[in-house]
Amino acid sequence: MSSLLVALPVAAHTLPPNPPLRIVATEQPTRTVAQVASEPPDATNTLRIVLLLPLESPLLRRAAVSVREGAAAVFGTRKTDVAVRECSYSTDGVVAAYSRCVDDKVDWVIGPLGRTDVTTLALAKMPSLRPTLMLSPLGTVPPQPMAVLAPDIESEGEAIAQQAVEDACRRPVLVEANSALASRVSVSIMSYWRGHIATPLAQATLGSRDTWRRLTDGWRRDNVDCILFAGGASVLSELRPFLRNMAVYVTSASFESALERTTDWTGVRIADAPWLVDADRAEFAAYLPAEPPSPTLARLYALGVDAARLVIAAGREALPATFAGAIGQLTLKDAQYRRHPMIGEFRERSLVKVGP
């Protein structure tokens, strides 16, 4: 899954203390939804939701917990009309878990999480498939009644390229550093540029640190005014002092640690989730965690918030065609939500929204 799903170490996370969320049942291999204890009197109006997450996966458990906590924050505000069942699985058991936990009484399934599991489930041709909001990209139109909600680094690359154009950058350079997501960011920036701008975009690859002074001095001689950066946070922090008087544009791939560590980033513009860029937005207030997580886990938390809000908005009908999400402005096309991230700017160890 995009920049948000990286190999994260196992951590002992649980739902927030005494969550108001009404869990009808947690995952137990010998039970099905139909065997859960009797429903409350208003059961016919209760929206039944299964959270299908890799809580048993060593690599994805921490990410899954963050998604679960975000969803729990939303469901906790609807405790009288939403019943949620957790259904965990390991890396090789998503189809078995779906079969075990989902029957025709379920209104929505949220999950799975992880590109491999999403692909496996979509191709499984389940005999009893319920409306399912999958949380990683599939790469093709999902089968009915499945849909995809997945944050992607590519939309952020396109957004910073567009912002650089709107900011009237005259001599921009795409700078790629060695990182896990750098090539994907670069490809998305170049794709946008070729499709919208007649002038070719110059490119450069960062070498060893002892070459940076010569490289950036050359940019100044060439009147380079904007840097579209594809790389990680640590490289950006080291490179930033060499980029004085140049506008810098980055994606969430460059923002991985706390704001306190962005001391020298003032003026850097970023395409990221509104949850991080516009954190004081009124509609987010009810869902904020007690302790703010790292930016990476915060994006996963926001994914859980959006997944829960979308299925509640849908109820037993179709998903909303457009939605102001915590991960971005969302538009549903071909059963997949296309995401438009928000542009923010770092200012003295804070992040503020750019524009209205």
Across the structure, where does each feature detected by a protein language model lie?
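Segments of small-molecule ligand-sensing domains
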Residues: 287-356
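Short beta-strand elements at the ligand-binding edges of bilobed clamshell
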Residues: 139-163, 264-275
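Extracytoplasmic "Venus flytrap"
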Residues: 31-69
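An alpha-beta-alpha
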Residues: 146-204
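Beta-alpha junction/loop-to-helix N-cap segments that form part of ligand/metal-binding clefts
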Residues: 62-66, 79-141, 235
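Periplasmic-binding protein-like
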Residues: 102-114, 132-135, 171-176, 201, ...
